[in-house]
Amino acid sequence: MRRLAAAGFKREIAREVVLPDWWDDSCASDPSLLPEIELRVARFVDAPLSLVRAADQPLSAPDYPGAQLRRVRDIHRDRLGPAIHLGLRVAEAAIRSWRGALPSLRVPPADPNLWREEMPRSSTVVRLPDVLADLWARGIPVIHIALMPSPSYQGMVCIVEGRPVVVLAHDFDEPARLAFVIAHEVAHVVHGDCEPGHPVVDEEDINPDDHDAEKRADMYSVRVLAGAAPIPRLEEADPKALARRADEIEQEHGVDAALVVRSWGKRTGEHAKATLAVAALYGMKGGKRAIREAFDRHIDLDGATETDRALLRCLHGEPQGHATPG
């Protein structure tokens, strides 16, 4: 485990994704178990078994030279390797563990307004559960990983087994912000930015990035969630006043009030004040639960292999039952 830690996978991660369910501290002194653990480590880090067995040789996460890093500040590509690797491994486990037959892949339209029109929902406002339900129905999983190597990233979209997977890794629980990040990552798919072997990795949405791909993805996400018209601007300065006006805009224009506030925060750079305003709207919690519930409706943990269940233990939340996908 020390070599895995040196490779960027700390003890708590190694304990979840490598060691079997029945493992306890007493097993560490049983040499007969070593071959199985070596095999598990080799499979996880994608390394030759001979290298894993050479105790004097260092282990490392695979290189991902094709990964496209966006909105990254002061982090070298190599340091994100372990987090990218774990995200891909968990994404693969989710695809393999789908409840029933994999649905046909239907990528959302390149026109964000058309996707918004097609998306089933119970009100004029597009919210996180609407985005999640539509993506899973299209055969595109969304997973939120809690146990991640550091440094990590906010969101990644990758192609696994021929279909996109959206991977979230920061500890956000704000539904509107998570919906924006998810739609942003989907934009990288519909615009052709994300290809097999070339995941798009966004470290943090508040980090500036003038790349055309990021501008397109931001605009796509805004249009999906808010519609074709520009998000009405807020002019208030006090967080409670911001929240009140944003709530009025939601009622008038059908745009999530928290999204209105976050748009103001991005325009002004007042992200801390925007967070206070979203809190005043009681909009800071519930995102993790919504993502977990959508996951549980579509993934069969009971039917998953032991190694896939281990990888999927890294996700936020506990299994909430086995409802049939709707």
Regions found by a protein language model. Name each.
Residues 1-326:
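Active-site hotspot residues in diverse enzymes, especially metal/ion-binding acidic/histidine motifs
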